[in-house]
Amino acid sequence: MSGGLDVLQMKEEDVLKFLAAGTHLGGTNLDFQMDQYVYKRKSDGVYIINLKKTWEKLLLAARAIVAIENPADVCVISSRNTGQRAVLKFASATGATTFHGRFTPGTFTNQIQAAFREPRLLIVTDPRADHQPLTEASYVNIPTIALCNTDSPLRYVDIAIPCNNKGHHSVGLMWWMLAREVLRMRGTISREHPWEVMPDLYFYRDPEEIEKEEQAAAEKAVGKEEFQGEWSAPAAEFTQPEVADWSEGVAVPSVPIQQFPAGTPAPAPAVKTEDWSTQPATEDWSTAPTAQASDWGGATSDWS
């Protein structure tokens, strides 16, 4: 459906998004009508979807959506939890009417009930799970678009977009791609610049995981406060007693203070200096008496 135009060709960043979300991974079963969209089969039995055909059918579905004058006449449905958030985001971006959750039987056929609708186009997430709206659409001649896996039945489906409709990342990415292409064909956003809305906003989030993340964030915040409290504790205050008279309790020697008249400098204190000249003369060591040698020979003096 790209018509050979370069502007409509699949970009490398789009292929990387498809591969990261696992859009090319089908199921282990294959419907005979989905055989034309399968590229190969892996050794573990999982079929690989041809992403080029996925992109072509995505462009065809976007053209069908843009052809509806009133965006509210486009009805998007997802009974599975993995596609409900993506459906709501798609309806918010394109102005479509959404039915998330359980589809009430007779919405398209029973004119008596208050929830009766007459859409001009129907888009479903899973033909197997959303079989009731597909069946009712066939009764009132409403064209249908569906995200189909390798084992999805194509009965009552007019435009099948081959992709992995089981994983929440793949489903969210496909709705994001479809919304972006619709806005580009309408001229709302430019093809020259990337869309500021991230695909993460279309992904389904489990409430239990959200609760666990909030609990972990709260525990982390409490731990951080305790950690800061240990290091930012106020230092102990040391108070010094006030002393009125610093000389109180200090022993002062009773020395008479000599008074000097004003203008007279006080004399320097006397320093006791010894007179080295009055010291006795050093003894003459040469005149010192020599000790008498003791008689080592005894009484005998004649050695011969």
Swiss-Prot record:
Family membership: Belongs to the universal ribosomal protein uS2 family.
UniProt keywords, alphabetically: Acetylation, Cell membrane, Cytoplasm, Membrane, Nucleus, Receptor, Repeat, Ribonucleoprotein, Ribosomal protein
Subunit and interaction comment: Monomer (37LRP) and homodimer (67LR). Component of the small ribosomal subunit. Mature ribosomes consist of a small (40S) and a large (60S) subunit. The 40S subunit contains about 33 different proteins and 1 molecule of RNA (18S). The 60S subunit contains about 49 different proteins and 3 molecules of RNA (28S, 5.8S and 5S). Interacts with rps21. Interacts with several laminins including at least lamb1. Interacts with mdk.
Biological-process GO terms, alphabetical: ribosomal small subunit assembly; translation
Pfam families assigned: 40S_SA_C (PF16122), Ribosomal_S2 (PF00318)
[DE]-W-[ST] repeats, residue ranges: 230-232, 245-247, 275-277, 284-286, 302-304
The protein's role, per its UniProt record: Required for the assembly and/or stability of the 40S ribosomal subunit. Required for the processing of the 20S rRNA-precursor to mature 18S rRNA in a late step of the maturation of 40S ribosomal subunits. Also functions as a cell surface receptor for laminin. Plays a role in cell adhesion to the basement membrane and in the consequent activation of signaling transduction pathways. May play a role in cell fate determination and tissue morphogenesis.
Positions of the UniProt region annotated as Laminin-binding: 161-180, 205-229, 242-304
Positions marked as site (Cleavage): A115, F116, P133, L134
Subcellular location: Cell membrane; Cytoplasm; Nucleus
One cellular component (GO) term of this entry: plasma membrane
InterPro entries: Ribosomal_uS2, Ribosomal_uS2_C, Ribosomal_uS2_CS, Ribosomal_uS2_euk, Ribosomal_uS2_euk/arc, Ribosomal_uS2_flav_dom_sf, Ribosomal_uS2_vert
PTM description: Acylated. Acylation may be a prerequisite for conversion of the monomeric 37 kDa laminin receptor precursor (37LRP) to the mature dimeric 67 kDa laminin receptor (67LR), and may provide a mechanism for membrane association.
Gene transcribed to yield this protein: rpsa
Upper lineage: Eukaryota, Metazoa, Chordata, Craniata, Vertebrata
Listed GO MF terms: laminin binding; laminin receptor activity; structural constituent of ribosome
Gene3D superfamilies reported in the protein's UniProt record: Glucose-6-phosphate isomerase like protein, domain 1
Protein name: Small ribosomal subunit protein uS2
N-acetylserine PTM positions: S2
Note: This protein appears to have acquired a second function as a laminin receptor specifically in the vertebrate lineage.
The species this protein was found in: Sparus aurata
CDD domains assigned: RPS2 (cd01425)
Residues covered by region (Disordered): 257-304
Source organism superkingdom: Eukaryota
Chief location category: membrane
Listed PROSITE patterns: RIBOSOMAL_S2_1 (PS00962), RIBOSOMAL_S2_2 (PS00963)
Residue spans of biased composition, Polar residues class: 276-293
NCBIfam families noted in UniProt: uS2_euk_arch
